[in-house]
Structures are given as structure tokens and as C-alpha cells.
Amino acid sequence: MARKMLKDEEVEVAVTDGGSYDYDLFVIGAGSGGVRGSRTSASFGAKVAICELPFHPISSDWQGGHGGTCVIRGCVPKKILVYGSSFRGEFEDAKNFGWEINGDINFNWKRLLENKTQEIVRLNGVYQRILGNSGVTMIEGAGSLVDAHTVEVTKPDGSKQRYTAKHILIATGSRAQRVNIPGKELAITSDEALSLEELPKRAVILGGGYIAVEFASIWKGMGAHVDLFYRKELPLRGFDDEMRTVVASNLEGRGIRLHPGTNLSELSKTADGIKVVTDKGEEIIADVVLFATGRTPNSQRLNLEAAGVEVDNIGAIKVDDYSRTSVPNIWAVGDVTNRINLTPVALMEATCFSKTVFGGQPTKPDYRDVPCAVFSIPPLSVVGLSEQQALEEAKSDVLVYTSSFNPMKNSISKRQEKTVMKLVVDSETDKVLGASMCGPDAPEIIQGMAVALKCGATKATFDSTVGIHPSAAEEFVTMRTLTRRVSPSSKPKTNL
């Protein structure tokens, strides 16, 4: 069945009178998108219910929690571990600033793990209170479709109950994938990596995406020997190639061993740990093997076919520009739709859904100039187009401005690690198409750049802006020398 793409005037605005249904809206999944969609819909007067699995730090078919992947087993606990890992470098840098650190500095993994768990338990409660204060009915259990207006919730005790709703919103997120190789059961995913009882001394990571790079930085900062394997020449496929090179250099500079163009072929248990065999015949012994090879939409147990909801070849729910599925009253937001899989994007999609369905304001999510960050050490952050993307879209030449410098702090600490910044500009309009930064505080700085790009800032706007001195951020408004001018007809290497 082909999806009908809605026009603005065709978007039905819900009448929140309940009608013959139990609820105006039933939401499956209380992650970032589900919670936002629930409470904003309730603020428009809708009668809303939401179902979610019982809380647990590690997800499964029967375990979840309010806040979803980001809060419980993703962005938040990961960032806490990044903070914890960063102190090793700070202690090293402190010496040349006059700090005399005598004796051993011991790291207590169990204490950090305990405090991390306490924080996500707290946040799980915060999300429940937000829903309760918004008037949303919370139901514990796993939801699945019976038909276009009925959801069946399987409770933790195995009992089942059905609820009807005029509209259904699916916001079940995604789950980590495992590579199908012999011994795969010996590996862990990011879920387990955030809750390990013991900190590994020897870690092998398979994958070149942001999760792989972040855990490589985390474990190395905590003292582990880390080997990172990935299929391409550089990690972070999809990011700007020049910035990918910078990240790879920084990882190696921090002591992480990179294995580009290499895959794992087999894992086996030995007396000394896990034996890892690569497709090049190399063998390594590790305490932990992490599969960081991507995530897949959480749609398998929703019984979507019962209502006629279409999915693509990886199980992502197909939606139109308003997040409506192939069934007119069923909607989906967040990772389960596999659009831009970021928490703030799920929040945006859910807000647009509520405005469209219950607010009388048909609103499409705007995916232009969405910023993102990789919390490696140091971090990478970007907004807008990479140089390669700009060349694919440009009708005129692309102007590239770059700055590579030693931050003031490194001048004293003697750390050999440069900060790199980049602006991509349309030569015809002078509009800044993209901004990238790899270095300390990059995500904090790029968030401000995102506002500038969203407002249509030109290079002249940047040049006329007064900087804050001394700061790294001022480099973005002092890059006046053109690094290179690139024609769209050129063919940059894109399969790195």
C-alpha cells in the first residue's frame, strides 16, 4: 500500500472529546519522543496514555524505563563516563600549571558506576513526574497493535489489557545490533558497556561510528589498552573527511590503537580472556569485546502488520513529512523511523506531531542545520553541511576556511593536540553552509554556530562579529584567509 503524502490543508486536527475511544492519544514508548509527544498533546487538551517497560539499565524485550535510551543507556550515562574519563588528562595537564600530585591517583570504577546508576534512576523518576504532572496516564508493560485504534499492553505479570485511542503514536526507539560471527555471544553492546561490573584492562571495539569512538576514549582515559577496528580508512563515516582525519589522529595521539580496513571474524573464550581473530589473521586477547556496529529500529514486537503499518527493509516505520504512517491515525517519531537518530530531533518531531494533531497547527519537522556531537576526547561537533555534502549540493564553488592551532592551555601543559575548526561557504551567496570543530568545548561552541546557520548567517556576518579573547571560539570569527576554493565539478574521495 502506497503512503499518502499529506498536504498542509489535508492534516486532520483531532477533536479531543474522547468519542467512543478510551483516549485521544495512546503512546507506545516513554523515551524522549514519547514523553514529549504525550505531554505536549496533553497540554492541548488531549486525553493521553503512555505505556513503557519496567526500568532497568540494560534494555531487553521486557525491560526499559521512562526516558528511554538517551537517559538510561545512551547519551546521559555515556556523558557521565566521558566526564569521569577526562580527569586522567586533566591530572596530566595540571603538572605544568603548578599542581604537584604526589603518589598514585587511583580510579574507583565501582563508585562512578554507582553514581551513574543513581543519576539515571533519578532521571527515570523525573520523567514519570513530568508525565504525571501533565495529566498523562502511565501504564507499565509492552504495547503492541491489535488494529488501527487498539493497543494491547502485556503487563510485567503476563496479564494483557487492551486500550482504544483515536490516535496512536509509536516512539519505541532503537536497539544495538550484534555482528553475526562465531562467538558473538561473548561480545557486549553499548547497553552492557555502561554497566560493566569490572573495568576492562584490555578492550577491543568493533565499529567506526560515534559509539565506538566514544567508548574508545572512555576506556583509554580510564587506563585500558584499547584496539579499535573498523572497515573504512577513517572512523566516523558520514562526517567531514578532514575532521575525521583529525579525530583519528587524536585517538592515536591518546594511545588508542587503530585498525582501519579490518573486521573481526571470530571470538572464542580462553583462560586468559577472549581471543579475537580478525579477517587479516591477527589475534588479540581482550577482557571485553564491544560491538558498536550501529542500531536498528525497535519495531519487531509491535505487531505493526495487524494495523497495516508499513516498514522499510531494516524495520524502520515509514512516515510522511508530518510523521504519519501508512495508517492515517497512527504516527511515529524518533529512532524507530530512522530519520536523524538524535534525541533533540525526536523531541522536535514529537512537538511537531502534537501541534499537527492536537494544536491545530500543521507543522513539519525541519531537518536543516541540525547540530550534533561526538563525545570523543577531545570532542568533535558539526552543524550544517560537510565539505563533501556542500560540493554535492552546490551550484557554485565552495569556499573552505580552516584554522588549526594549539589551544592556550596546551601551550602550558605541553599536550601535543591541536584544535581544528572549519567553515564551508557558498561562493555565490556568501552563506555559511557548515561549521565543524574538533577540540575542547566543541559541542558548546557549535550549539551557538547552529543558531547562526539557522538564521542564514554569511561569512561577512562572521567576519564582522567581535570575538571573545582569549578563547578558542573567537577563531570562528577571525578566519579570514581562504584555505581553498573547490569546484562542484571536482570529485572528492568519499569512500574513506
Curated annotation (Swiss-Prot):
Main location: cytoplasm
Origin superkingdom: Eukaryota
Cofactor binding annotation: Binds 1 FAD per subunit.
GO terms of molecular function: flavin adenine dinucleotide binding; glutathione-disulfide reductase (NADPH) activity; NADP binding; thioredoxin-disulfide reductase (NADPH) activity
Residues noted as binding glutathione in the record, renumbered to the chain: S32, Y127
PROSITE patterns in the record: PYRIDINE_REDOX_1
Disulfide bonds: C70-C75
Short name of any one Pfam family annotated for the protein: Pyr_redox_2
Gene3D superfamilies named among the record's database cross-references: 3.30.390.30, FAD/NAD(P)-binding domain
Entry-linked NCBIfam families: gluta_reduc_2, PRK06116.1
Further comment: The active site is a redox-active disulfide bond.
Protein name per UniProt: Glutathione reductase, cytosolic
Gene: GRC2
